[in-house]
Curated annotation (Swiss-Prot):
This is ATP-dependent helicase/deoxyribonuclease subunit B. InterPro entries: ADDB_N (IPR049035), DNA_helicase_suRexB (IPR014141), P-loop_NTPase (IPR027417), PDDEXK-like_dom_sf (IPR011604), PDDEXK_AddAB-type (IPR038726), Restrct_endonuc-II-like (IPR011335). GO terms for molecular function: 5'-3' exonuclease activity; ATP binding; double-stranded DNA binding; helicase activity; hydrolase activity, acting on acid anhydrides. It comes from Streptococcus pyogenes serotype M1. Its EC number is 3.1.-.-. The gene is rexB. The heterodimer acts as both an ATP-dependent DNA helicase and an ATP-dependent, dual-direction single-stranded exonuclease. Recognizes the chi site generating a DNA molecule suitable for the initiation of homologous recombination. This subunit has 5' -> 3' nuclease activity but not helicase activity.
Amino acid sequence: MKLIYTEMSYSMTEILVNEARKAADQGYRVFYIAPNSLSFEKEREVLTLLPERGTFSIIVTRFVQMSRYFTVESSPSKQHLDDTTLAMIFYRALMQLKPEDLPSYGRLQNNSVFIEQLVELYKELKNAQLSVHDLTGLDHPQKQEDLIKIIELAETIMIQQDYNQDSPLQSFARAIKLGLLNNQLSKTVVVIDGFSRFSAEEDYLLSLLNNNCQEVIIGSYVSQKAYQKSFIKGNIYEASLHFLQDLAQKYHIKPVFATSNQVFKPAFSRLTQLFEATHDFSQVDWQLQKSDLDHFSLWQCHHQKEEIEHVAKSIRQKLYEGYRYKDILVLLGDMDAYQLQIGPIFDKFEIPYYLGKAEPMAAHPLVQFIESLERSQRYNWRREDILNMLKSGLFGCFDDSDIDRFEEYTQFADIKGFTKFSKPFTINSSRQYPLDFLNEMRQDIVLPLQELFKSQKQLGASLVDKLILFLKKIRLAENMQGLAQSQLEVEKNEEVWKRFTDILTSFHHIFGQEKLRLSDCLALIKTGMKSAQYRVVPATLDVVTIKSYDLVQPHSKPFVYAIGLTQSHFPKQIHHSGLLSDQERARINEIRNYRHFDIASAENSKKNHQTALSLFNAATKELVLSVSTVINETFDDLSPYLKELINFGLPLLDKGKNYLSYDNSDIGNYKALLSQIIAINRQDLIEMSDQDKMFWTVVLRYLRKQLRKQQLELPTSDYRLSTKPLSKEVIEVCFPKGIPLKLSATALTVFYNNQYNYFLKYVLNLNKTESIHPDSRIHGQYLHRVFERLMKDHTQEPFDNKLKQAIYHTNQESFFQQVYQDNAEAEYSLAILEDIVRSTAPILQLNQNIQVIDQEKNFQLDMGNEILVHGIIDRIDQLSDGSLGIVDYKSSANQFDIGTFYNGLSPQLMTYLAALKQIAPHDINQLFGAMYLHLQDPKLDLVTFKQIDNTLVESIYKALTYKGIFSEVEKEHLSTGAYQTKNALYSNDELETLLNYNKYLYLKAAKHIKKGHFLINPYTSDGKTVQGDQLKAITRFEADLDMGQARRLVTLPAKEKKECFLTLMRKESHL
């Protein structure tokens, strides 16, 4: 064995490549070994350093791959054992054990996390060269007993199913020990680069290779200063020193110092020396030179999105200077936090990249389909799960519009559960759903699912066959092929499909002869799919590489950007969580030779120093270290390592927000520039100098010219929220000449509430989602129907009998039966409505001096100027003197307010009066009023009553009164009825003024509607808060930003309020 060390300013790879070339020139076969995470980059680097740029004598690979070169022909043809297969084996083993067999873990038998921990422990035992019987000295002896039962049973299953229990390295080591590879190894030289420690498995293999190979050469970075130190605790080279010292002591070799021809920039060397001096308690009498600062940059950004954008702009600048994407490396401090954002931003700047991390399959449509299938079976056909299956695009041949219509209907009819899905859809609504088509679609969905879900407990092989038959019926494979939109997606789908078929094969192999329920089968497949990962190799090598910063090696790329280096992630604190604690692992390690657990938490300090050292030397030309103060909406501090660099004299540059400028980095990429122009066009203008304004004026003029060629535009507006008028063609279609504009009191109220809301409801005809479950609209229909029946009953039956008959016959109507007898909740609503009817009905019995002459009266009121107002009057009453009035039933409290009416928000009563005036017989000229009747079950606070007497009854009937607007002429006739006339009496002239102003409101609204320009103007009564419908989800209206667009209501003081509003009405309606 030969041990080599060198300073960070030299290239260890070049030194080891020279050693490899010498061995190859002598006729030896050379294996150049790199860590798993670095083998791809190391292979490219080694080939670059070879003069011939390639050779068959030097193979750059990993330990695992190297073993296959020697054992591929002699290895037994057994089944491959991966993590998913292991999990299934442990699940089967736990199925065969009873809870009482496992005192410590009996309650966790079906816990997926526990099974994952078993898989991790089993893999650790293999890497550590340990068996489950070596787990002595645990905190609880029962833990070892349980683990022995579980793992031994799992290993028995592996033997029965012919799975290979040995790892590739174990098989390689066994072959070496048996002397099967002596001839080949005698002509082999092994060169090892990039390691600072070996696992127990690698350590044991290394000892065998050292005894049988021609030579083993290992290199590591250690400074000569550190190598000569006797005390190395806390030294930045502590990990490498321990690594070399352990090998030197074990193999009785003295490491040698070597140098390379290639010497990197002295700026990095000087920074490394300062970093070393800080941690080995020595001092230096010099500082970084001014020229050294050109190779380092420390950035601080406010948010991670801005941080990534700054990096993207800098990369574009490097390309402008002539560098390639492959010259750039981006390192992430927090892979999970940055992974989702860095892709879209790099795509915006058109930067091709390769993310050096396996992607989880959990977000793939196939996994979502399997998960929805499993949940549909487990939760008895829940609607959300069925719809998720359809939306995955993998179930059957349904268009998106068909799925949307199916979803809309199932939500309306509340279809959920197998019973409802299995029955034909018969319920319809005013929207007239295409039931024939929906039932055909229902059958195409239900029949294959029903055939699969009715499977009883049976052999696993039979379940897999039925599942495959189901997947064929729904054309899963064909739909999977149709998902891909690009070559990259094709490759991803192929990897996911291969993983899916492997999982099915493993399940068939392990559970083929075991009896299982379908739910267990689907749960196991779902778990395997969700935990699986896949990789896609980039189509070209000229890409920006992105990976975690702790996987970096020295001198990786000319330009390195390390971002997200906060205190929480740099350094990383690794804590193991599993079935064994670190203390238990340490006790086991004390008594084993060549066999030991890796305890990551025990090596945090020296590993972090080693990572920081590699990071500070990762670039050969320029290193950018960046930190964001906010990551995932959480504030974080600077890394202590970055604080050390600041003490060395490196300035911390606050990059700030990404304001637009005319630097090359801002305008050098068309796609990024366009996105920023759009962004700035949507926000308030920032302050600019005259030079900036001139520059952007010219740029915008040029950009608009280019956009016009592509029929695109950048809209400009004086307000944050604005709307466009409808085109003449649309106006002619929506409001054709010669055809009256149809309005109603409700439509007029919506218009004056918010014009844009009128546009949505009455021009676009957008409706809210319907539901078969009773809502306020259906409750109102029920109450109206009961009172309509009651008032039509002119028999001599007692009033209470009439009321009972009205309730009974209304409940028997098919529509109300369908609505109120569907479930217990609907039945409870019906009971409440019946109580309301019984509580409100007595008011009708008390008013014996009125006669109901009509109910549910449809009308059409001609307002002139091609305006037709339509509606339904709930009830028309006639007093004893022949005067007429209208009653409008309300399920909530309402009363006429002249100010609300003036502002157009309460035109209903006056509209009904105008209609009644038009349809009333010619011999009846007098109207006594228009009123609301609140249908309610009055609630009284008994604490306010001193005793139970007539005052209690009076309070109940006081709540049951007619409230509205009444004629002063009819005051005497109204005084004997349940009419609340206080502050509600108007003279005939005043009533005429109200009617004329009501007509004016309609004419004014119609004129504006026919122009086709609808404003976003919800009303405000005080100028501080907005009471109108803001429609935030559609308009993005924000009261604090858009108060200027709200319509301010006219409000007057309570004193003389009536007279003042009447005066305003006369002026505006030209009276």
